[in-house]
């Protein structure tokens, strides 16, 4: 190529790069120039901006000699929407064949495969890009892909999730001011939380990463997936006010995505049904309730009543039977409560298994049991003992509605004694988390 031609090609590429950068800036900073009310138009506006950009790129290219970089930029422009583009796949595949060291083309091609649902090929692209050059985009994308790879065993999936956290941390280390890296680290911790028995320390790390994403990058606050994923964690931790707020914000930012609205509605219905059942004690008639409570026996405490109870630290201890009304917020160590089930409530998500417990004429308490298999449950009239109950008082206000109740959180059915009997290990399952894979 002659010097003049080289200069011309360089000038063309600079112009193309500028057009593509402007297109991505339009998409990523959309809510800095538009209000949340315009959220429903965003996809259409981005599509129109993409078409305009492609037209301008054609004019700039003219009869200039096409090379890998130009193919990559055109493929990247086509890849700006959330949808899979076959044309982008063709252009980017050509670009990496012409210039295998072109890391950005590998990253873009990986994203195309990701949108196509071909997770294995996406993984190959991002891993391949990292062999050419360590870069934060490949690390971010690899972190996402690892959590979606098909595996033959739970152990293999756990290894992928741990690796996903590692890659996200590396991305953060490369640029601590990149909000996307922090957001992806939050998602990796979210998966780890559900994959390793819901350790509160890990949920705190997820929430901190999401907060950091918003702190370093204003655009992160406009990401509906961040709000939905954080709300999922809040819901599981029974911070219902924050969960409702998150679902509502995600729905406002992406009105055409039905999931946030559905999740907000489901949670509101759950809280409404729960508070109604708690107030009416499961609609149990006073005479029936007296008869149920009269049949409670010390034998119903099982191992919680004979000094055989083993605490989390492994030591055997005697628990003191106390009324529900005397419980303090938090874990009530050295205490056991015993009551009768007056209702149970299942949700579409099946988690938690919720039931109402009474032990006197006092109020009815919600008991929320996590990590249960679908076949497990308790029946109305069952006697249930809960050792070292973890109490929480809820005061929730959302969109003009108030919900107020007290609940006891039980991490596994194995902690409960039902009708004097400890629960079988087959009653326990582990929780999973679902996310919108192509939209991290």
Swiss-Prot record:
Tissue: Expressed in heart, brain, spleen, lung, liver, skeletal muscle, kidney and testis.
Induction (record text): Stress-responsive protein. Induced upon UV or ionizing irradiation (at protein level). Induced upon heat-shock stress (at protein level).
Chain positions found as Phosphoserine: 203, 221
An example Gene Ontology molecular-function term: chromatin binding
Keyword Secreted: no
Result for mutant: residue 203 to D: No change in subcellular localization in non-stress conditions. No change in protein accumulation and stability in response to DNA damage
Mediates interaction with 28S rRNA of ribosome-coding tubulin, as annotated region: 285-287
Keyword terms of this UniProt record: Cytoplasm, Cytoplasmic vesicle, DNA damage, DNA repair, Mitochondrion, Nucleus, Phosphoprotein, Repeat, TPR repeat
Signal sequence extent: none
Source organism of this protein record: Mus musculus
Protein name: Tetratricopeptide repeat protein 5
Cellular localization per UniProt: Nucleus; Cytoplasm; Cytoplasmic vesicle; Mitochondrion matrix
Site keyed Mediates interaction with N-terminal MREI motif of beta-tubulin nascent chain: positions: 147, 225, 259
Domain of life: Eukaryota
TPR repeats: 7-61, 68-98, 103-130, 136-174, 179-216, 224-253
Function of the molecule: Cofactor involved in the regulation of various cellular mechanisms such as actin regulation, autophagy, chromatin regulation and DNA repair. In physiological conditions, interacts with cofactor JMY in the cytoplasm which prevents JMY's actin nucleation activity and ability to activate the Arp2/3 complex. Acts as a negative regulator of nutrient stress-induced autophagy by inhibiting JMY's interaction with MAP1LC3B, thereby preventing autophagosome formation. Involves in tubulin autoregulation by promoting its degradation in response to excess soluble tubulin.
Motif (Nuclear export signal): 13-24
InterPro entries, sorted: TPR-like_helical_dom_sf, TPR_rpt, TTC5_OB, TTC5_OB_sf, Ycf3/AcsC/BcsC/TPR_MFPF
GO cellular component: cytoplasm; cytoplasmic vesicle; cytosol; mitochondrial matrix; mitochondrion; nucleoplasm; nucleus
Keyword Heme on entry: no
Oligomeric and partner information: Interacts with JMY and p300/EP300; the interaction occurs in the nucleus and augments the association between JMY and p300/EP300 in response to DNA damage. Interacts with PRMT5; the interaction is DNA damage-dependent and promotes PRMT5 interaction with p53/TP53 and subsequent methylation. Forms a complex with HSF1 and p300/EP300; these interactions augment chromatin-bound HSF1 and p300/EP300 histone acetyltransferase activity, resulting in enhanced heat-shock-responsive transcription.
Listed Pfam families: TTC5_OB
Domain notes: The tetratricopep-repeat (TPR) motifs may function as protein interaction domains.
Gene3D superfamilies, A to Z: 2.40.50.550, Tetratricopeptide repeat domain
């Amino acid at each position: 190529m002659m010097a003049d031609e080289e200069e011309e090609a360089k000038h063309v590429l600079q112009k193309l790069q500028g057009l593509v950068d402007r297109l991505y800036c339009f998409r990523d900073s959309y809510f800095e120039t538009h209000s949340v009310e315009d959220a429903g138009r965003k996809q259409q506006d981005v599509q129109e901006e993409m078409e305009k950009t492609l037209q301008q790129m054609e004019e700039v290219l003219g009869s200039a000699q096409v090379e890998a970089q130009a193919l990559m930029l055109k493929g990247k422009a086509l890849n700006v929407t959330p949808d899979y583009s076959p044309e982008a796949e063709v252009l980017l595949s050509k670009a990496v064949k012409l210039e295998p060291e072109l890391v950005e083309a590998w990253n873009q091609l990986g994203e195309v495969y990701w949108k196509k649902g071909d997770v294995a090929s996406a993984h190959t692209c991002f891993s391949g890009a990292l062999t050419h050059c360590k870069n934060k985009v490949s690390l971010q994308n690899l972190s996402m892909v690892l959590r979606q790879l098909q595996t033959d065993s739970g152990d293999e999936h756990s290894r992928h999730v741990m690796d996903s956290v590692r890659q996200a941390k590396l991305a953060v280390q490369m640029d601590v001011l990149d909000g996307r890296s922090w957001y992806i680290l939050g998602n990796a911790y979210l998966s780890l939380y559900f994959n390793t028995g819901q350790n509160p320390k890990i949920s705190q790390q997820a929430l901190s990463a999401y907060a950091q994403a918003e702190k370093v990058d204003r655009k992160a606050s406009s990401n509906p997936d961040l709000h939905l994923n954080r709300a999922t964690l809040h819901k599981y931790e029974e911070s219902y006010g924050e969960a409702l707020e998150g679902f509502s914000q995600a729905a406002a930012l992406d009105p055409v995505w039905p999931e946030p609205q559905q999740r907000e509605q489901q949670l509101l219905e759950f809280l409404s049904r729960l508070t109604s059942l708690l107030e009416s004690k499961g609609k149990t008639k006073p005479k029936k309730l007296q008869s149920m409570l009269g049949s409670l026996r010390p034998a119903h405490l099982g191992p919680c009543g004979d000094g055989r109870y083993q605490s989390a630290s492994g030591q055997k201890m005697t628990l003191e039977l106390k009324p529900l009304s005397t419980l303090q917020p938090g874990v009530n160590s050295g205490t056991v409560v015993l009551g009768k089930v007056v209702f149970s409530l299942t949700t579409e998500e099946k988690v938690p298994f919720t039931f109402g417990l009474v032990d006197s004429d006092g109020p009815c308490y919600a008991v929320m049991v996590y990590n249960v298999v679908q076949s497990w449950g308790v029946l109305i009239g069952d006697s249930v003992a809960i050792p070292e109950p973890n109490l929480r008082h809820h005061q929730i206000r959302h969109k003009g509605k108030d919900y107020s109740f007290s609940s006891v959180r039980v991490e596994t059915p194995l902690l409960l004694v039902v009708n004097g009997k400890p629960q079988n290990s087959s009653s326990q399952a582990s929780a999973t988390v679902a996310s919108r894979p192509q939209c991290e």
